[in-house]
Regions:
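Repeat-based blade/solenoid architectures
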Residues: 96-101, 250-256, 306-312, 354-362, ...
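Hydrophobic/tyrosine-rich beta-strand signature of extracellular beta-sandwich/beta-rich modules
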Residues: 29-33
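Short, exposed coil/turn segments at beta-strand boundaries within extracellular/luminal domains
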Residues: 36-44
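Surface-exposed, flexible coil segments in extracellular/virion-facing regions
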Residues: 2-21
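Preference for solvent-exposed, low-hydrophobicity sequence contexts
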Residues: 113-320, 324-325, 336-337, 341-347, ...
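An edge-strand/N-cap motif at the start of beta-rich repeat modules
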Residues: 48-78
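Blade-level signature of beta-propeller repeat domains, shared across WD40, Kelch, NHL, RCC1
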Residues: 375-422
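Loop/turn-rich, solvent-exposed surfaces of beta-rich toroidal or solenoidal domains
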Residues: 308-381
Length: 422
């Protein structure tokens, strides 16, 4: 007996048991039988074998349990019972993630092959989107220039358009990451030159948030209370040409820490909305529309929220399909801001959803089609897998699905899409 897969012999037994560990794709297979008494007489059958990865398409959740990050996966293909595969990074790579969970994302298939990125405070991991095997590791050994320490408070590498990203270290410095580079670019200068005035240097203390664009990034400085747009002048000698060596400081004073941002639509084009909140003073503000450089669009773009329900631990998300901004009150209650309301008469409308009393919202993620909102909650169950995820209707809050014990405390989620060879 002989079995072949793409012309490669894989077995010589009557019954075949074979694990495909290469690519999930369509293979050409052949089973061949040779009569023992006459080697010249052979029987064979050719057929196709379609191999799918168990991680082809579904929900990827990054959660945290007592500073132990973990990745869980739930397939949305032929999974009627919503079976959840937990700790899939450790399962496929035979080692555990370290640090504090920060973010998980998947790149665009056509420009970056659908690569999955997992970010923690200790390291960033580039994973094969089919096998979840680690392709690249970015840690303290992945810097172009010297780094004071590797302990990130924010990190995202991938943007579907720009393929550019970066991280903020505990040292308050930005470490850019360019697509397909196996390292971080040189860290941003601190203090840094002001655009148009090479003699002026300013210090900064960033909120743990970035809006990355091509060869630049938008940060928010808690010292000046303004957006700072980090760029490279190409005039100041550095370790590499991508080092951020100058900033453009926004003219608009906000004076509150940056909580988060999201894309919204206006006239068929994307713009950005940002939420600001200071838990010490309990003051909040909304930048309804601004550019990727931090410039506010329109005189009424900055609104200080008097009737807000933000609190320490609040999370937010923007639905670009209906231009709503969702945020939590630090507990189980959701609120919505209508970014398209011209008068903005109702800045905080309760968004009712029948979540249980014994939970705290820790994650909000709008679905790719903008029709649903994934709500990650931490329950009071005395166990490791205390994190649940609810899929709710994006307009009325109706619970569509409940994924119980998805992981630890939910931090970030991505709707993993299949790639061409899966």
């Amino acid at each position: 007996y002989a079995w072949y897969l793409d012309q490669k012999k894989i077995a010589e037994t009557e019954d075949l048991c074979y694990v495909v560990s290469d690519k999930a794709k369509k293979y050409q297979a052949r089973m061949e039988v040779t009569l023992p008494e006459d080697d010249s007489v052979r029987f064979f059958a050719d057929f196709e074998v379609q191999v799918f990865s168990p991680y082809s398409k579904g929900l990827l959740l990054l959660s945290d349990y007592e500073d132990y990050p973990e990745v869980s996966f739930m397939s949305t293909l032929n999974n009627p019972t919503n079976k959840i595969m937990r700790d899939v990074y450790s399962l496929e790579n035979k080692r555990e993630l370290k640090g504090k969970a920060l973010a998980i994302e998947q790149s665009d298939e056509y420009s970056y092959g659908g690569t999955v990125f997992v970010h923690t405070s200790a390291s960033s991991h580039e994973l094969d989107p089919v096998l979840f095997k680690e392709i690249a590791l970015f840690d303290e050994n992945s810097f172009t220039g010297p780094a004071q320490e590797y302990d990130m408070v924010y990190c995202r590498f991938e943007d579907a358009i720009t393929e550019f990203g970066g991280a903020i270290g505990k040292d308050g410095i930005i470490y850019p990451k360019q697509a397909r580079q196996s390292r971080y670019m040189a860290s941003s200068l601190k203090p840094i030159h002001v655009e148009g005035d090479e003699e002026r240097l300013v210090d900064y203390r960033l909120s743990p948030m970035l809006l990355n664009t091509r060869n630049s990034t938008l940060g928010y400085d808690n010292l000046s209370g303004r957006f700072m747009y980090f760029m490279n002048s190409y005039d100041i000698p550095s370790y590499d040409e991508n080092q951020y060596d100058e900033v453009r400081i926004s003219e608009t004073y906000i004076g509150l820490p940056w909580l988060g941002w999201g894309k919204n639509m206006s006239g068929g084009t994307y713009q950005f909305s940002s939420l600001f909140y200071d838990p010490v003073t309990d003051r909040a503000a909304l930048a309804r529309a601004h550019t990727a450089t931090g410039k506010l669009k329109g005189q009424d773009s900055l609104v200080f929220l008097s009737g807000h329900h933000l609190a320490e631990g609040s999370v937010m998300a923007v639905n670009s399909g209906i231009n709503w901004l969702y945020y939590s009150d630090g507990g189980r209650q959701l609120y919505v801001l209508n970014l398209s309301d011209p008068d903005f008469k109702f800045p905080s409308i309760p968004f009712e959803c029948a979540l249980p009393d014994n939970c705290r919202i820790t994650m909000l993620k709008v679905s790719v089609d903008n029709l649903a909102l994934f709500v990650g909650v931490e329950t009071d169950r005395p166990e490791k897998y205390k994190g649940d995820v609810y899929k709710i209707n994006a307009k009325d809050g109706t619970i569509l699905e409940h994924y119980q014990r998805f992981g630890g405390t939910p931090v970030d989620m991505v709707e993993k899409k299949s790639v061409e060879y899966d």
